[in-house]
Protein backbone atom coordinates (compact mmCIF):
# COMPACT_ATOMS: atom_id res chain seq x y z
CA UNK A 1 0.00 0.00 0.00
CA UNK A 2 1.29 3.46 -0.90
CA UNK A 3 2.00 5.69 2.07
CA UNK A 4 0.36 9.11 1.98
CA UNK A 5 2.55 12.13 2.68
CA UNK A 6 2.14 13.54 6.19
CA UNK A 7 3.06 17.17 6.77
CA UNK A 8 2.22 16.77 10.45
CA UNK A 9 4.64 13.86 10.86
CA UNK A 10 7.40 15.67 8.97
CA UNK A 11 6.87 18.78 11.10
CA UNK A 12 7.00 16.80 14.33
CA UNK A 13 10.17 14.96 13.28
CA UNK A 14 11.98 18.11 12.18
CA UNK A 15 10.95 19.95 15.37
CA UNK A 16 12.24 17.05 17.47
CA UNK A 17 15.56 17.14 15.58
CA UNK A 18 15.89 20.90 16.06
CA UNK A 19 15.31 20.44 19.78
CA UNK A 20 18.14 17.88 19.89
CA UNK A 21 20.45 20.19 17.93
CA UNK A 22 19.96 22.87 20.60
CA UNK A 23 20.91 20.51 23.44
CA UNK A 24 24.48 20.22 24.70
CA UNK A 25 23.86 17.25 27.01
CA UNK A 26 21.33 14.41 27.31
CA UNK A 27 19.99 12.72 30.41
CA UNK A 28 19.97 8.92 30.61
CA UNK A 29 16.46 8.46 29.22
CA UNK A 30 17.05 10.90 26.35
CA UNK A 31 20.25 9.06 25.50
CA UNK A 32 18.50 5.69 25.37
CA UNK A 33 15.68 7.10 23.27
CA UNK A 34 18.08 8.73 20.79
CA UNK A 35 20.11 5.55 20.37
CA UNK A 36 16.95 3.60 19.63
CA UNK A 37 15.63 6.24 17.23
CA UNK A 38 18.87 6.43 15.26
CA UNK A 39 19.06 2.66 14.83
CA UNK A 40 15.41 2.49 13.78
CA UNK A 41 15.68 5.34 11.28
CA UNK A 42 18.88 3.93 9.74
CA UNK A 43 17.07 0.63 9.32
CA UNK A 44 13.84 2.07 7.94
CA UNK A 45 14.91 5.21 6.07
CA UNK A 46 18.69 5.35 5.44
CA UNK A 47 20.05 1.86 4.69
CA UNK A 48 19.89 -1.16 7.02
CA UNK A 49 23.14 -2.43 5.53
CA UNK A 50 25.07 0.29 7.35
CA UNK A 51 24.18 -1.29 10.68
CA UNK A 52 26.11 -4.41 9.67
CA UNK A 53 29.30 -2.48 8.96
CA UNK A 54 29.45 -0.17 11.96
CA UNK A 55 32.32 -1.01 14.33
CA UNK A 56 30.90 0.98 17.25
CA UNK A 57 29.11 -1.93 18.89
CA UNK A 58 29.24 -2.70 22.61
CA UNK A 59 30.07 -6.15 23.96
CA UNK A 60 26.33 -6.71 24.36
CA UNK A 61 25.71 -5.99 20.68
CA UNK A 62 24.21 -2.54 21.22
CA UNK A 63 25.08 0.40 18.98
CA UNK A 64 25.99 2.40 22.05
CA UNK A 65 28.31 4.92 20.45
CA UNK A 66 25.99 7.11 18.41
CA UNK A 67 27.99 10.23 17.54
CA UNK A 68 27.01 13.23 19.58
CA UNK A 69 29.76 15.83 19.56
CA UNK A 70 33.47 16.48 19.26
CA UNK A 71 35.42 16.23 22.49
CA UNK A 72 38.69 18.03 21.92
CA UNK A 73 40.53 18.55 18.65
CA UNK A 74 41.26 14.84 18.40
CA UNK A 75 38.38 13.10 20.16
CA UNK A 76 34.70 12.26 19.75
CA UNK A 77 32.09 11.91 22.50
CA UNK A 78 29.13 9.53 22.22
CA UNK A 79 25.66 9.90 23.69
CA UNK A 80 26.81 8.09 26.83
CA UNK A 81 29.59 10.58 27.44
CA UNK A 82 32.36 8.18 26.41
CA UNK A 83 35.33 9.87 24.76
CA UNK A 84 37.24 8.22 21.90
CA UNK A 85 40.60 9.14 20.39
CA UNK A 86 39.87 9.51 16.69
CA UNK A 87 42.34 7.49 14.61
CA UNK A 88 39.92 7.23 11.70
CA UNK A 89 39.62 10.95 11.03
CA UNK A 90 36.41 10.58 9.04
CA UNK A 91 38.54 8.82 6.36
CA UNK A 92 40.81 11.83 6.17
CA UNK A 93 38.65 14.91 6.68
CA UNK A 94 39.85 15.99 10.14
CA UNK A 95 43.46 16.96 9.35
CA UNK A 96 43.18 20.11 11.48
CA UNK A 97 41.15 18.33 14.14
CA UNK A 98 37.50 18.39 15.16
CA UNK A 99 35.85 21.79 15.32
CA UNK A 100 39.11 23.62 14.90
CA UNK A 101 38.33 27.05 16.38
CA UNK A 102 39.94 28.98 13.52
CA UNK A 103 37.87 27.11 10.93
CA UNK A 104 34.65 27.28 12.96
CA UNK A 105 35.13 31.01 13.55
CA UNK A 106 35.67 31.70 9.84
CA UNK A 107 32.51 29.80 8.90
CA UNK A 108 30.46 31.46 11.65
CA UNK A 109 31.66 34.92 10.60
CA UNK A 110 30.74 34.24 6.97
CA UNK A 111 27.41 32.73 8.03
CA UNK A 112 26.56 35.99 9.78
CA UNK A 113 27.06 37.84 6.49
CA UNK A 114 25.99 35.67 3.56
CA UNK A 115 25.82 31.85 3.64
CA UNK A 116 25.41 31.16 -0.10
CA UNK A 117 26.26 33.08 -3.24
CA UNK A 118 23.87 34.76 -5.67
CA UNK A 119 25.21 32.85 -8.73
CA UNK A 120 25.34 36.17 -10.59
CA UNK A 121 27.62 38.52 -8.66
CA UNK A 122 31.31 37.74 -8.29
CA UNK A 123 31.94 36.03 -4.93
CA UNK A 124 35.11 37.20 -3.14
CA UNK A 125 35.99 34.05 -1.19
CA UNK A 126 35.95 31.81 -4.26
CA UNK A 127 38.43 34.20 -5.90
CA UNK A 128 40.62 34.31 -2.80
CA UNK A 129 40.63 30.54 -2.36
CA UNK A 130 41.56 30.02 -6.02
CA UNK A 131 44.44 32.49 -5.64
CA UNK A 132 45.55 30.75 -2.42
CA UNK A 133 45.55 27.32 -4.08
CA UNK A 134 47.49 28.67 -7.05
CA UNK A 135 50.17 29.80 -4.60
CA UNK A 136 50.08 26.61 -2.51
CA UNK A 137 50.04 23.89 -5.17
CA UNK A 138 53.16 22.73 -7.04
CA UNK A 139 54.27 23.56 -10.56
CA UNK A 140 52.11 25.52 -12.98
CA UNK A 141 48.74 24.73 -11.38
CA UNK A 142 46.81 27.99 -11.55
CA UNK A 143 43.02 27.70 -12.00
CA UNK A 144 40.51 26.00 -9.69
CA UNK A 145 37.05 24.54 -10.15
CA UNK A 146 35.21 24.10 -6.83
CA UNK A 147 32.70 21.41 -5.95
CA UNK A 148 31.46 19.53 -2.89
CA UNK A 149 33.31 16.21 -2.72
CA UNK A 150 36.26 14.17 -3.90
CA UNK A 151 34.14 12.25 -6.36
CA UNK A 152 32.99 15.51 -7.95
CA UNK A 153 36.57 16.77 -8.17
CA UNK A 154 37.55 13.58 -10.04
CA UNK A 155 34.52 13.89 -12.35
CA UNK A 156 35.59 17.44 -13.16
CA UNK A 157 39.16 16.28 -13.81
CA UNK A 158 37.97 13.59 -16.23
CA UNK A 159 35.73 16.04 -18.10
CA UNK A 160 38.47 18.65 -18.20
CA UNK A 161 40.95 16.13 -19.62
CA UNK A 162 38.37 15.04 -22.20
CA UNK A 163 37.67 18.62 -23.24
CA UNK A 164 41.39 19.34 -23.62
CA UNK A 165 42.37 16.11 -25.38
CA UNK A 166 39.34 15.36 -27.57
CA UNK A 167 40.41 17.85 -30.29
CA UNK A 168 43.75 16.02 -30.30
CA UNK A 169 42.05 12.67 -30.91
CA UNK A 170 42.91 11.29 -27.46
CA UNK A 171 40.09 9.57 -25.58
CA UNK A 172 41.64 6.79 -23.46
CA UNK A 173 42.29 6.96 -19.71
CA UNK A 174 44.71 4.79 -17.75
CA UNK A 175 44.07 4.11 -14.06
CA UNK A 176 45.58 1.48 -11.78
CA UNK A 177 44.54 -1.73 -10.07
CA UNK A 178 43.48 -1.13 -6.47
CA UNK A 179 42.57 2.48 -7.26
CA UNK A 180 39.68 4.31 -5.63
CA UNK A 181 38.55 7.58 -7.22
CA UNK A 182 34.89 7.72 -6.20
CA UNK A 183 31.57 6.11 -7.04
CA UNK A 184 29.81 8.38 -9.51
CA UNK A 185 29.81 6.97 -13.04
CA UNK A 186 32.93 8.69 -14.36
CA UNK A 187 34.96 8.34 -11.18
CA UNK A 188 33.81 4.73 -10.84
CA UNK A 189 35.19 4.01 -14.30
CA UNK A 190 38.64 4.86 -12.92
CA UNK A 191 38.03 3.01 -9.64
CA UNK A 192 39.26 -0.59 -9.79
CA UNK A 193 37.17 -2.48 -7.22
CA UNK A 194 34.72 -4.95 -8.77
CA UNK A 195 32.43 -4.76 -5.72
CA UNK A 196 31.58 -1.17 -6.63
CA UNK A 197 31.82 -1.47 -10.42
CA UNK A 198 29.92 -4.63 -11.35
CA UNK A 199 26.36 -3.54 -10.42
CA UNK A 200 26.69 -0.47 -12.67
CA UNK A 201 28.26 -1.97 -15.79
CA UNK A 202 28.78 -0.84 -18.47
CA UNK A 203 30.74 2.14 -17.20
CA UNK A 204 32.33 4.88 -19.31
CA UNK A 205 34.26 3.43 -22.27
CA UNK A 206 37.95 4.02 -22.74
CA UNK A 207 39.28 3.24 -19.26
CA UNK A 208 42.19 0.82 -18.89
CA UNK A 209 43.82 -0.41 -15.68
CA UNK A 210 47.43 -1.43 -15.07
CA UNK A 211 49.12 -2.68 -11.86
CA UNK A 212 49.87 0.16 -9.44
CA UNK A 213 53.58 0.80 -9.02
CA UNK A 214 54.59 -1.12 -12.15
CA UNK A 215 56.22 1.40 -14.46
CA UNK A 216 56.86 -1.20 -17.18
CA UNK A 217 53.15 -2.03 -17.30
CA UNK A 218 52.37 1.69 -17.60
CA UNK A 219 54.82 2.11 -20.48
CA UNK A 220 53.46 -0.98 -22.24
CA UNK A 221 49.86 0.23 -21.96
CA UNK A 222 50.69 3.71 -23.25
CA UNK A 223 52.63 2.18 -26.14
CA UNK A 224 49.91 -0.34 -27.05
CA UNK A 225 47.22 2.34 -26.95
CA UNK A 226 49.25 4.50 -29.31
CA UNK A 227 49.81 1.57 -31.71
CA UNK A 228 46.08 0.80 -31.86
CA UNK A 229 45.02 4.43 -32.25
CA UNK A 230 43.52 4.56 -28.74
CA UNK A 231 45.78 7.44 -27.74
CA UNK A 232 45.77 8.23 -24.03
CA UNK A 233 44.17 11.46 -22.86
CA UNK A 234 45.27 11.13 -19.24
CA UNK A 235 46.74 8.90 -16.57
CA UNK A 236 44.95 9.16 -13.22
CA UNK A 237 46.70 8.06 -10.03
CA UNK A 238 46.64 8.35 -6.26
CA UNK A 239 50.21 9.03 -5.06
CA UNK A 240 49.43 6.56 -2.26
CA UNK A 241 46.38 4.33 -2.60
CA UNK A 242 44.16 5.01 0.40
CA UNK A 243 41.08 2.82 0.10
CA UNK A 244 43.20 0.23 -1.67
CA UNK A 245 44.98 -0.40 1.64
CA UNK A 246 47.51 2.45 2.00
CA UNK A 247 49.67 1.10 -0.81
CA UNK A 248 52.89 3.03 -1.47
CA UNK A 249 54.47 2.76 -4.93
CA UNK A 250 58.21 2.10 -5.33
CA UNK A 251 60.51 5.09 -5.01
CA UNK A 252 60.75 6.87 -8.36
CA UNK A 253 57.43 5.57 -9.70
CA UNK A 254 55.59 8.90 -9.80
CA UNK A 255 58.44 10.80 -11.52
CA UNK A 256 58.69 7.98 -14.05
CA UNK A 257 54.93 8.19 -14.75
CA UNK A 258 55.27 11.96 -15.19
CA UNK A 259 58.05 11.38 -17.72
CA UNK A 260 55.96 8.83 -19.64
CA UNK A 261 52.99 11.21 -19.76
CA UNK A 262 55.23 13.88 -21.26
CA UNK A 263 56.63 11.38 -23.77
CA UNK A 264 53.18 10.22 -24.95
CA UNK A 265 51.41 13.58 -24.67
CA UNK A 266 49.07 12.40 -21.91
CA UNK A 267 47.93 14.54 -19.00
CA UNK A 268 48.77 13.47 -15.46
CA UNK A 269 45.86 13.67 -13.02
CA UNK A 270 46.84 13.19 -9.38
CA UNK A 271 44.01 12.33 -7.01
CA UNK A 272 45.14 13.79 -3.68
CA UNK A 273 41.67 13.77 -2.14
CA UNK A 274 43.00 11.64 0.74
CA UNK A 275 46.75 12.31 0.63
CA UNK A 276 46.56 16.09 0.29
CA UNK A 277 46.50 18.88 2.88
CA UNK A 278 49.49 17.70 4.89
CA UNK A 279 48.41 14.11 5.50
CA UNK A 280 51.65 12.41 4.38
CA UNK A 281 54.16 14.88 5.84
CA UNK A 282 54.13 17.30 2.90
CA UNK A 283 51.28 19.60 1.91
CA UNK A 284 50.74 17.30 -1.10
CA UNK A 285 52.10 13.76 -1.43
CA UNK A 286 53.45 14.47 -4.92
CA UNK A 287 55.90 16.92 -3.34
CA UNK A 288 57.89 14.07 -1.78
CA UNK A 289 59.36 13.46 -5.25
CA UNK A 290 58.75 16.90 -6.77
CA UNK A 291 56.15 15.63 -9.24
CA UNK A 292 53.98 18.28 -10.88
CA UNK A 293 50.59 17.16 -12.23
CA UNK A 294 48.55 18.80 -14.96
CA UNK A 295 45.40 18.38 -12.86
CA UNK A 296 45.18 17.97 -9.07
CA UNK A 297 42.08 16.70 -7.23
CA UNK A 298 41.47 17.83 -3.64
CA UNK A 299 38.62 17.43 -1.13
CA UNK A 300 38.13 15.78 2.28
CA UNK A 301 40.44 17.77 4.61
CA UNK A 302 40.24 20.89 2.44
CA UNK A 303 37.08 21.87 4.34
CA UNK A 304 38.73 21.50 7.74
CA UNK A 305 36.23 18.90 8.91
CA UNK A 306 33.60 21.65 9.08
CA UNK A 307 32.33 22.12 5.51
CA UNK A 308 32.35 19.82 2.46
CA UNK A 309 34.39 21.17 -0.44
CA UNK A 310 36.35 19.76 -3.35
CA UNK A 311 38.69 21.42 -5.83
CA UNK A 312 40.04 20.52 -9.25
CA UNK A 313 43.18 22.57 -9.83
CA UNK A 314 44.76 22.69 -13.30
CA UNK A 315 47.37 24.46 -15.36
CA UNK A 316 46.30 27.42 -17.46
CA UNK A 317 46.96 25.47 -20.66
CA UNK A 318 44.52 22.72 -19.68
CA UNK A 319 41.93 24.85 -17.88
CA UNK A 320 41.73 27.38 -20.72
CA UNK A 321 39.38 25.05 -22.66
CA UNK A 322 36.68 26.29 -20.27
CA UNK A 323 37.40 30.00 -20.79
CA UNK A 324 35.07 30.51 -23.76
CA UNK A 325 32.16 28.87 -21.97
CA UNK A 326 32.64 28.76 -18.18
CA UNK A 327 29.24 27.07 -17.86
CA UNK A 328 30.38 23.84 -19.56
CA UNK A 329 30.87 22.31 -16.11
CA UNK A 330 29.36 23.95 -13.03
CA UNK A 331 27.65 23.04 -9.77
CA UNK A 332 25.18 25.11 -7.76
CA UNK A 333 26.89 24.83 -4.40
CA UNK A 334 30.51 24.52 -5.54
CA UNK A 335 32.69 27.30 -4.16
CA UNK A 336 29.98 28.62 -1.86
CA UNK A 337 31.07 31.23 0.72
CA UNK A 338 30.81 28.95 3.76
CA UNK A 339 32.89 26.19 2.16
CA UNK A 340 35.49 28.64 0.87
CA UNK A 341 35.74 30.27 4.31
CA UNK A 342 36.40 26.84 5.81
CA UNK A 343 39.04 25.99 3.20
CA UNK A 344 40.87 29.30 3.58
CA UNK A 345 40.94 28.89 7.35
CA UNK A 346 42.12 25.29 7.02
CA UNK A 347 45.05 26.27 4.81
CA UNK A 348 45.92 29.04 7.27
CA UNK A 349 45.98 26.56 10.18
CA UNK A 350 48.02 23.99 8.23
CA UNK A 351 50.65 26.63 7.41
CA UNK A 352 50.80 28.60 10.67
CA UNK A 353 50.98 25.45 12.82
CA UNK A 354 53.27 23.64 10.35
CA UNK A 355 51.00 20.60 10.51
CA UNK A 356 52.54 18.76 7.54
CA UNK A 357 55.86 18.64 9.42
CA UNK A 358 54.02 17.52 12.55
CA UNK A 359 52.39 14.76 10.51
CA UNK A 360 55.83 13.55 9.43
CA UNK A 361 57.14 13.51 13.02
CA UNK A 362 54.13 11.90 14.67
CA UNK A 363 53.64 9.53 11.78
CA UNK A 364 57.19 8.22 12.20
CA UNK A 365 56.53 7.74 15.91
CA UNK A 366 53.34 5.77 15.32
CA UNK A 367 54.78 3.72 12.45
CA UNK A 368 57.82 2.78 14.54
CA UNK A 369 55.53 1.76 17.41
CA UNK A 370 53.22 -0.30 15.22
CA UNK A 371 56.18 -2.02 13.55
CA UNK A 372 57.59 -3.04 16.93
CA UNK A 373 54.20 -4.53 17.80
CA UNK A 374 54.12 -6.34 14.46
CA UNK A 375 57.45 -7.96 15.34
CA UNK A 376 55.97 -9.12 18.67
CA UNK A 377 52.80 -10.47 17.03
CA UNK A 378 53.88 -11.99 13.68
CA UNK A 379 51.10 -14.56 14.05
CA UNK A 380 48.53 -11.73 13.85
CA UNK A 381 50.13 -8.90 11.82
CA UNK A 382 51.45 -9.26 8.27
CA UNK A 383 52.74 -5.73 7.67
CA UNK A 384 52.69 -2.13 8.85
CA UNK A 385 53.08 0.56 6.17
CA UNK A 386 52.36 4.22 5.59
CA UNK A 387 53.68 7.73 5.22
CA UNK A 388 53.08 10.58 7.63
CA UNK A 389 49.70 10.20 9.30
CA UNK A 390 48.32 7.82 6.66
CA UNK A 391 49.05 4.33 7.97
CA UNK A 392 47.80 0.78 7.65
CA UNK A 393 48.12 -2.37 9.75
CA UNK A 394 47.58 -5.45 7.62
CA UNK A 395 46.45 -8.52 9.56
CA UNK A 396 46.59 -12.18 8.59
CA UNK A 397 42.87 -12.25 7.75
CA UNK A 398 39.66 -10.21 7.80
CA UNK A 399 38.40 -11.64 11.06
CA UNK A 400 41.54 -10.67 12.99
CA UNK A 401 41.37 -7.16 11.53
CA UNK A 402 37.71 -6.77 12.44
CA UNK A 403 38.38 -8.03 15.98
CA UNK A 404 41.29 -5.59 16.30
CA UNK A 405 39.02 -2.66 15.35
CA UNK A 406 36.45 -3.85 17.90
CA UNK A 407 39.10 -4.22 20.62
CA UNK A 408 40.42 -0.73 19.88
CA UNK A 409 36.85 0.57 20.14
CA UNK A 410 36.58 -0.98 23.58
CA UNK A 411 39.84 0.80 24.47
CA UNK A 412 38.23 4.06 23.29
CA UNK A 413 40.23 4.40 20.07
CA UNK A 414 38.41 4.60 16.72
CA UNK A 415 39.96 2.81 13.74
CA UNK A 416 38.41 1.04 10.76
CA UNK A 417 39.22 -1.09 7.76
CA UNK A 418 39.41 0.11 4.20
CA UNK A 419 36.12 -0.07 2.30
CA UNK A 420 34.60 -3.55 2.65
CA UNK A 421 37.91 -4.95 3.90
CA UNK A 422 38.82 -5.38 7.56
CA UNK A 423 42.06 -7.25 6.86
CA UNK A 424 43.80 -3.90 6.49
CA UNK A 425 43.04 -1.45 9.29
CA UNK A 426 43.62 2.18 8.42
CA UNK A 427 45.06 4.58 10.99
CA UNK A 428 44.38 8.15 9.85
CA UNK A 429 44.17 10.48 12.87
CA UNK A 430 44.01 14.27 12.88
CA UNK A 431 47.41 15.84 12.31
CA UNK A 432 46.81 17.67 15.60
CA UNK A 433 47.02 14.42 17.60
CA UNK A 434 49.24 15.09 20.63
CA UNK A 435 52.35 13.06 21.44
CA UNK A 436 50.60 11.86 24.60
CA UNK A 437 47.64 10.67 22.53
CA UNK A 438 50.05 8.89 20.16
CA UNK A 439 51.37 6.99 23.18
CA UNK A 440 47.82 6.16 24.26
CA UNK A 441 47.05 4.77 20.81
CA UNK A 442 50.12 2.54 20.88
CA UNK A 443 49.25 1.29 24.38
CA UNK A 444 45.71 0.53 23.23
CA UNK A 445 47.06 -1.35 20.20
CA UNK A 446 49.33 -3.43 22.44
CA UNK A 447 46.40 -4.34 24.71
CA UNK A 448 44.20 -5.14 21.71
CA UNK A 449 46.80 -7.45 20.17
CA UNK A 450 47.39 -9.21 23.49
CA UNK A 451 43.65 -9.82 23.85
CA UNK A 452 43.45 -11.11 20.27
CA UNK A 453 46.29 -13.56 20.79
CA UNK A 454 44.50 -15.00 23.83
CA UNK A 455 41.23 -15.36 21.93
CA UNK A 456 43.01 -17.01 18.96
CA UNK A 457 44.83 -19.46 21.23
CA UNK A 458 41.58 -20.34 23.00
CA UNK A 459 39.69 -20.90 19.75
UniProtKB/Swiss-Prot annotation:
It is an enzyme of class 2 (transferase). It comes from the Bacteria. One of its GO terms (molecular function) is putrescine--2-oxoglutarate transaminase activity. SUPFAM superfamilies: PLP-dependent transferases (SSF53383). Pyridoxal 5'-phosphate binds at residues 150-151, 274, 332. Keywords: Aminotransferase, Pyridoxal phosphate, Transferase. GO terms for biological process: L-lysine catabolic process; putrescine catabolic process. It catalyses: an alkane-alpha,omega-diamine + 2-oxoglutarate = an omega-aminoaldehyde + L-glutamate; putrescine + 2-oxoglutarate = 1-pyrroline + L-glutamate + H2O; cadaverine + 2-oxoglutarate = 5-aminopentanal + L-glutamate. InterPro entries: Aminotrans_3 (IPR005814), Aminotrans_3_PPA_site (IPR049704), Class-III_PLP-dep_AT (IPR050103), Putrescine_aminotransferase (IPR017747), PyrdxlP-dep_Trfase (IPR015424), PyrdxlP-dep_Trfase_major (IPR015421), PyrdxlP-dep_Trfase_small (IPR015422). Pathway: Amine and polyamine degradation; putrescine degradation; 4-aminobutanal from putrescine (transaminase route): step 1/1. Coiled coil: none annotated. Its EC number is 2.6.1.82, 2.6.1.29. HAMAP family: Putres_aminotrans_3. NCBIfam families: PRK11522.1 (NF008570), putres_am_tran (TIGR03372). Belongs to the class-III pyridoxal-phosphate-dependent aminotransferase family. Putrescine aminotransferase subfamily. This is Putrescine aminotransferase. It comes from Klebsiella pneumoniae (strain 342).
